[in-house]
A protein has these predicted regions:
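Amphipathic alpha-helical segments used for helix-helix packing
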Residues: 33-52
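Short, structured helix-loop boundary elements
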Residues: 18, 22, 54, 87-91, ...
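C-terminal peripheral helix-coil segments that are non-catalytic and often amphipathic
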Residues: 23-30, 34, 66, 70-78, ...
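Hydrophobic alpha-helical connector segments
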Residues: 9-38, 90-94
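Amphipathic alpha-helical packing segments from all-alpha helical-bundle domains
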Residues: 52-78, 88-96
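Secondary-structure edge/capping motif, primarily at the C-terminal ends of alpha-helices
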Residues: 8-14, 42-46, 105
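Conserved hydrophobic residue
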Residues: 80-82
Length: 135
């Protein structure tokens, strides 16, 4: 049986990258929304806390940012994130979008996994149709 060529390997890497990002999105939203009282307060008032309190929480925030940077870089290495995409900007965009769900998403009335799949679709496959094409 012939060995898969580089194109097949590239598709497999992209699927693996997409799975890593989609899984991270799902876990973030599941955890974030499950502990919404704490996370809501943390996200909304962090900048207003006294410097000493912010400083005590900063290490945990930095570790979480580093985790997301690692996820993004792993996806980039697998061919799932364009080389020109700035890791920090992508992380801030993604976390900001997911954290904003506190404002409008009600886990009692909606499905978190469905929401995560929609976010992953937007991030991984984009919004616009391919240039010159129509869907």
């Amino acid at each position: 049986m012939p060995k898969p060529g580089p194109r097949a390997d590239s598709r497999v890497s992209r699927v693996a990258s997409a799975t890593v990002v989609a899984t991270a999105i799902r876990h973030h939203l599941q955890t974030f929304l499950a502990f919404s009282d704490y996370t809501s307060a943390n996200v909304r008032i962090f900048g207003q806390l006294p410097a000493a309190v912010r400083q005590r929480n900063l290490a945990a925030r930095r570790r979480y940012e580093l985790l997301w940077d690692t996820i993004i870089e792993r996806a980039r290495t697998g061919g799932g994130v364009r080389p020109a995409v700035d890791t920090a900007t992508f992380r801030l965009f993604l976390l900001g979008a997911m954290n904003a769900t506190l404002e409008w998403f009600d886990p009692a009335r909606g499905d978190i996994d469905r929401l995560a799949a929609r976010y992953a679709d937007l991030v991984l496959d984009g919004v616009l149709t391919p240039a010159g094409g129509m869907e």
